């Protein structure tokens, strides 16, 4: 795949509950299919079963942990063991804030004595980035009780639209040469003239942006990261009634999540990480967020799948 973005960007919510599982919601986990790459963001207890239920597959390339509270990472123990039992040989990289190396090594050793595949653990700080195939995942420091990160998946810019009439006017041969120009290569036209991509392509098109807040109080770093994002996934553990509890535990209310989306001018907001008290009825959270943010809002549920369309 070229560095000109991706075609597929599909999200599957594996777990949407805060702190403890419920009948309807598992602990935190999000699978992101970025063309051929499969990424996990957090891996709460039971995530591997959710991956089986919702058909994401186990061919995970990287796991990004927002922080190391138990409900966000203890599922890695069983997941690693299952990968080993399945005969995996390709490398796996685990990313997260400090103390990722210590905690993840301990977790992995609880599950297996020896791994049949290479495992790398990388600690990330605010501003760090990881390059993928057609995208970059950036780390953003947030405000939680422990060291915690939000993540920004930014698709690479895509070439501008191909001007067919202009290409024909420049005597570009139809077929493979059209594709070469769209991939950023120059070609020789039938009249012998050299045609550059800029001669037949419109303005560069921005890539899609996905922002995953993890556990956090509302903070300026997330607002900045989510500026005009295609999708902001923000935690909404509490309602207005639990504002003091949100402050104590360094979580967000649904209203605060809506306010973050509004300040960021995000194009879409999905609320997740809900307290068990809203397991059966999350309408209160949705209504409070809507009082702050006028854009599209949804409450995530386990198994929910979202595909982000390409930007024009």
Task: Write out the residue ranges for each language-model feature.
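Conserved beta-strand hairpin/beta-sheet module of binuclear metal-dependent hydrolase folds
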Residues: 2-56, 91, 151-153, 160, ...
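Active-site neighborhood of divalent metal-dependent phosphoester bond hydrolases
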Residues: 85-123, 277
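Active-site metal-binding motif and surrounding structural segment of the metallo-beta-lactamase
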Residues: 45-95, 123
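General small-molecule cofactor/ligand-binding pocket signal
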Residues: 12, 95, 120-125, 138-140, ...
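Active-site neighborhood of phospho(di)ester-bond hydrolases with catalytic His/Asp-centered motifs
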Residues: 41-44, 61-68, 97, 211-216, ...
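A short helix->loop->beta-strand "cap" motif at the edges of active sites that frequently abuts
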Residues: 88-92, 264-268, 295
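Metal-dependent phosphodiesterase/nuclease catalytic metal-binding core
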Residues: 2-3, 31, 125-271, 282-287, ...
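Metal-dependent catalytic neighborhoods of phosphoester/phosphodiester hydrolases
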Residues: 75-83, 107, 279-289
């Amino acid at each position: 795949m070229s560095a000109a973005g991706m075609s597929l960007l599909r999200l599957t919510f594996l777990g949407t509950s805060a702190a403890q599982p419920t009948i309807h919601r598992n602990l935190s986990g999000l699978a992101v299919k970025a063309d051929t790459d499969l990424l996990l963001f957090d891996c709460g207890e039971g995530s591997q079963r959710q991956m089986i239920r919702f058909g994401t597959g186990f061919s995970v390339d990287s796991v990004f942990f927002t922080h190391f509270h138990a409900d966000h990472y203890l599922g890695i123990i069983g997941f690693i063991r299952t990968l080993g039992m399945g005969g995996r040989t390709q490398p796996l990289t685990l990313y997260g804030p400090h103390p990722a190396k210590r905690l993840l090594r301990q977790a992995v050793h609880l599950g297996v004595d020896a791994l049949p595949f290479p495992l790398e653990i990388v600690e990330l700080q605010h501003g760090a980035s990881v390059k993928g195939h057609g995208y970059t995942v950036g780390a953003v420091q947030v405000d939680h009780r422990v060291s915690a990160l939000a993540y920004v998946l930014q698709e690479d810019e895509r070439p501008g639209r191909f001007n067919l009439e202009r290409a024909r006017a420049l005597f570009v041969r139809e077929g493979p040469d059209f594709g070469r120009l769209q991939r950023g290569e120059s070609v020789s036209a039938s009249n012998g003239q050299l045609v550059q991509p800029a001669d037949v392509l419109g303005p560069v098109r921005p890539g899609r942006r996905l922002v995953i807040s993890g556990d956090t109080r509302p903070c300026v770093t997330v607002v900045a990261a989510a500026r005009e994002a295609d999708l902001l996934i923000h935690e909404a553990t509490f309602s207005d009634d639990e504002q003091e509890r949100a402050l104590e535990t360094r979580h967000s209310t649904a209203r605060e999540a809506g306010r973050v989306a509004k300040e960021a001018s995000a194009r879409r907001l999905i609320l997740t990480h809900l307290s068990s008290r809203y397991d059966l009825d999350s309408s209160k959270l949705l209504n409070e967020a809507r009082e702050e943010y006028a854009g599209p809002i949804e409450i995530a549920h386990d198994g929910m799948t979202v595909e982000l369309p390409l930007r024009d």
